[in-house]
Regions:
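Rhodanese-like catalytic fold shared by cysteine-dependent sulfurtransferases
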Residues: 2-6, 15-37, 43, 52-84, ...
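Structural scaffold elements adjacent to functional motifs in cytosolic proteins
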Residues: 45-47
């Protein structure tokens, strides 16, 4: 059953994204550089953790798009491709996966390499 669910999730992540287009990748940065990136008001900050993790504390201004949620791919496909995205999770694994998907969808992405665990700035609850 889990295999089927993971297969469906993988298929859904491909919807709306053109994987045949060469992408430039994404920047994986430390907390200091990430703080500089998100100072730009045009940057959309995305927290890829679960809603429960998000509610425990998140970077101010972040929106929650759970990478393990059913609607992750659909929500990413709806994002404004003209806005740069800054993405993070708890420790870096989920945000790297999300960043790869977002880049395949045509988004410009900066990823917080070691997640919110490395964040020294303000956290909002």
């Amino acid at each position: 059953m889990k295999t089927i669910l993971y297969s469906l999730l993988a298929a859904m992540m491909m919807i709306g994204c053109d994987n045949s287009v060469a992408t430039k990748g994404f920047d994986s940065v430390d907390a200091t550089r990430f703080a500089e990136v998100i100072e730009n008001e045009q940057v959309l900050i995305i927290d890829t953790r679960t809603p429960a993790e998000f509610n425990e504390g998140h970077i101010p201004g972040a929106v929650n798009i759970d990478i393990d949620g059913e609607e992750f791919a659909a929500k990413v496909a709806e994002l404004d491709k003209s806005r740069p995205v800054a993405v993070y999770c708890r420790g870096g694994r989920r945000s790297k996966e999300a960043a790869e998907h977002m880049v395949s969808c045509g988004l410009e992405v900066t990823e917080l390499a070691e997640g919110i665990l490395s964040w020294k700035g303000e956290v909002e609850k």
